[in-house]
């Protein structure tokens, strides 16, 4: 889908082998595909009105997720109303992966091609795809670890186990040994998503969390992912890995409200309730930063 006319945008059929591969990792249903959709939407908006031309190939699930997120704001509602269907974002089924190619070029210049590989959460808990996983990691220059910020922060992290921190940690340590890789230098980005509530609190001068909330997210990630961060920044590995923490606003006008579950019961996606908030529209922020 070109953002410009056919004469400006590189033809989708002529997209060549990628120069950069980005791999998205995270637990099941944390929202990797939704984040990828918001990233694509944000970068499209940045490119609009410039001399950049974009084309993409594949990624129907990305299109579906983007359309679903926009649809949430088309129904009649008021600020603070509960959001219907917010938990039904597209998810990668079984051991499937989303393969999405993005071609970016200035007019009359050779395009740069980025390939996004969005792996299902099952990959990090199962060794049957080990060879395929190793191949994709080998080819990736950037690895994005998607984190559900609500699970990370609420109830003092009671439900953070659903972010599968230990599984993600072991997966990366087992599959990203610099000594065993040809393409050993990588950027590893921890990307907490669904930060709307915490971002609003952080910027509300009347809140007890004013200027504190976003820092608290970063601190919690450093605490929960300490083993992985220690591995990535160890004296032997730090020359290979560039590490960053980049919070993103996935939706903009929808934020976490409450859990509707009794203590002791298993938390399901439908137990996580969201509500409409300002700016009351699909307005992701900072999603283009990982790009």
Could you describe each region identified by the protein language model?
Residues 19-21, 97, 111, 185-187, ...:
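Extracellular structured ligand-interaction cores
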Residues 18, 31, 138-139, 184:
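Residue-level preference for short coil/turn positions at secondary-structure junctions
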Residues 85-144, 151-158, 171:
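Switch II of P-loop NTPase G domains
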Residues 12-15, 107, 134-136, 177-182:
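Surface-exposed acidic, glycine-flexible loop patches that form ligand/cofactor-binding
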Residues 139-291:
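Conserved GTP-binding G-domain of TRAFAC-class P-loop NTPases and closely related GTPase folds
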Residues 3-94, 103-114:
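Conserved G1/Walker A P-loop phosphate-binding module
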Residues 41, 121, 196-197:
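Active-site micro-motifs of SAM-dependent methyltransferase domains
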């Amino acid at each position: 889908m070109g953002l410009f006319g056919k004469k400006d945008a590189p033809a989708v059929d002529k997209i060549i082998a990628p120069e950069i591969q980005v791999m998205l990792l995270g637990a099941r249903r944390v929202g990797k595909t939704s984040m990828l959709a918001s990233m694509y939407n944000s970068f499209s908006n940045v490119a609009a009105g410039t001399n950049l031309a974009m084309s993409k190939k594949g990624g129907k699930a990305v299109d579906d997720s983007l359309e679903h997120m926009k649809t949430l704001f088309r129904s009649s509602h008021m600020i603070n109303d509960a959001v219907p269907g917010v938990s039904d974002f597209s998810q990668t089924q079984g051991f499937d992966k989303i393969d999405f190619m993005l071609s970016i070029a200035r007019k009359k210049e050779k395009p740069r091609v980025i390939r996004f590989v969005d792996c299902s959460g099952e990959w990090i808990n199962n060794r049957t795809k080990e060879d395929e996983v190793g191949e994709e990691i080998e080819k990736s220059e950037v690895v994005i670890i998607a984190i559900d910020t609500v699970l990370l922060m609420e109830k003092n992290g009671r439900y953070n186990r659903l972010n599968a921190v230990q599984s993600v940690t072991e997966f990366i340590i087992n599959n990203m040994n610099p000594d065993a890789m040809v393409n050993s230098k990588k950027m590893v980005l921890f990307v907490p998503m669904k930060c709307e509530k915490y971002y609003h609190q952080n910027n509300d001068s009347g809140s007890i969390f004013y200027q504190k909330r976003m820092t608290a997210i970063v601190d919690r990630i450093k605490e929960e992912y300490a083993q992985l961060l220690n591995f990535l920044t160890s004296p032997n590995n730090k020359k290979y890995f560039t590490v960053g923490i980049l919070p993103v606003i996935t939706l903009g006008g929808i934020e976490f409200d409450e859990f509707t579950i009794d203590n002791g019961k298993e938390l399901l996606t439908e137990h996580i309730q969201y509500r409409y908030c300002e700016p009351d529209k699909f307005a992701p922020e900072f999603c283009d930063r990982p790009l």
